[in-house]
Amino acid sequence: MQTPGVLLLILGLLDASSSALIRIPLRKFTSIRRTMTEVGGSVEDLILKGPITKYSMQSSPRTKEPVSELLKNYLDAQYYGEIGIGTPPQCFTVVFDTGSSNLWVPSIHCKLLDIACWVHHKYNSDKSSTYVKNGTSFDIHYGSGSLSGYLSQDTVSVPCKSDLGGIKVEKQIFGEATKQPGVVFIAAKFDGILGMGYPFISVNKVLPVFDNLMKQKLVEKNIFSFYLNRDPTGQPGGELMLGGTDSRYYHGELSYLNVTRKAYWQVHMDQLEVGSELTLCKGGCEAIVDTGTSLLVGPVDEVKELQKAIGAVPLIQGEYMIPCEKVSSLPIITFKLGGQNYELHPEKYILKVSQAGKTICLSGFMGMDIPPPSGPLWILGDVFIGCYYTVFDREYNRVGFAKAATL
C-alpha cells in the first residue's frame, strides 16, 4: 500500500505536468508550391506577377503611427497541427506561425465563388454554445490578394481532441474568413493560420492566442517550443509544446538571444559563412525566426552570391537546383548568432524533392528583399529550425536554440 506522502507526491507531479505542458503533434504535408509543381502547374499563374513580399511595415498617412501590413504567403509551409474552436470544439488544421499574430479559419458563410473554402473545414457559429458575435470586418493582405471576413469570439481548444490533454483559451477573438485570395489556398493542406508573433503585428490589434493564454495563466511558463522532424517520410512531423521544453528533442544546453524588435521574433545575426570562401551579413544583420516559412530567406543579392558559391543554378519560381551527386561535397554553412556557431551541413540545406517522376536536389535558400523600415532581414525558416530545437520565450523576450535530436 502506498503511503499518503507518496500518493500526494505522485498526484502533485501529475497535476504539475498536466497544467504546465501542452503538447500539440505536428504533421508534415506537401507544400502548396510542391503540390502545384508536381501536377505541372505554375505558382506564378496563381499569384500576382512580381515578387511576393512577406514582411512589410509602413506608417499610416493620417496618424504617422506604425501600421502592420502583413504581406505573407504560405507556399512553402509544411507543418500543421490541430486546434478546436467553439463548444463543442470544431477541429481545424492550422499552421502555427511565429511570423504572424492572427488566428483565422474559413467561415461557413464564405463566398459562393471561394473554392478554397469548399475543400476545407469551416467554422459554424450556430453549432457553438460559447460563440459571441463581434462582426468587425478584417483584411489580411497577401501576395495573391486580400483575405477578408469578420471577427468573432469563441473558445479555442489546443489541441482539439480532449483525449490528448490540453487547454481552453476563453473569449478568443479570431477571424472568420469569407474570402480567400486567388486560388492558392485550394492546394493548401491546412485550413487556417494561428499566428504566434507579438501583438504589434496583429491585424485589427486583436490579442493573439498565446497572449490570451498568458493572460489567463494557462501555462506555468510563458514559453513555447518547436521540434520539427526533417525526415521527408517521417511522422509525426514534430511537436509544438506550450509552457515548456522537452530535453528528449535536443542535445546539450539551450543558447539564448534577446529579441531585438517585438513584432516578429527578430534577433541579431553576427554573420553567415559559406565554407571558408564567402562571408555574408558582414558587420551583422537582423533575422526573423519563422515557423511559417519552410526555407532560408535572405536579401536577393546576397543569396545570389551564396547560390553561386555552392554551384546552384536557377530554375523557375525562384528555386535553385544542385546536381544530387555533388551534394556531399558542398560546404558547411555557418550562422553566427549570439557568439555561437550554428552549422548546416549540405544534406540539411539541400532539399530532395520529386518532380515529374524524378528526384531533384534544390537549394534551401531563397532570395527576397524586405524593404525598410522592417528590412533588410534574413528569415530562419524550417530548414534551420529542423536542425535546431527552438524555444520562443515571452517571459524574457528571447529565442533559444539547441541541436535537435534525431528520433
UniProtKB/Swiss-Prot annotation:
Keywords: Aspartyl protease, Disulfide bond, Glycoprotein, Hydrolase, Lysosome, Protease, Secreted, Signal, Zymogen. The active site is at 97, 290. GO terms for molecular function: aspartic-type endopeptidase activity; aspartic-type peptidase activity; endopeptidase activity; hydrolase activity; peptidase activity; peptide binding. It comes from the Eukaryota. Residues 21-64 form a propeptide. Its main location: other. Residues 79-402 form the Peptidase A1 domain. It catalyses: Specificity similar to, but narrower than, that of pepsin A. Does not cleave the 4-Gln-|-His-5 bond in B chain of insulin. Glycans are attached at residues 134, 258. Residues 1-20 form the signal peptide. Gene3D superfamilies: Acid Proteases. InterPro entries: Aspartic_peptidase_A1 (IPR001461), Aspartic_peptidase_AS (IPR001969), Aspartic_peptidase_N (IPR012848), Cathepsin_D (IPR033144), PEPTIDASE_A1 (IPR033121), Peptidase_aspartic_dom_sf (IPR021109). It is found in: Lysosome; Melanosome; Secreted, Extracellular space. One of its GO terms (biological process) is proteolysis. SUPFAM superfamilies: Acid proteases. GO terms for cellular component: cytosol; endosome lumen; endosome membrane; extracellular space; GABA-ergic synapse; lysosomal membrane; lysosome; melanosome. CDD domains: Cathepsin_D2 (cd05490). Disulfide bonds join 91-160, 110-117, 281-285, 324-361. It holds the Pfam family A1_Propeptide. Belongs to the peptidase A1 family. Acid protease active in intracellular protein breakdown. Plays a role in APP processing following cleavage and activation by ADAM30 which leads to APP degradation. Occurs as a mixture of both a single chain form and two types of two chain (light and heavy) forms. Interacts with ADAM30; this leads to activation of CTSD. This is Cathepsin D. It comes from Rattus norvegicus (Rat).
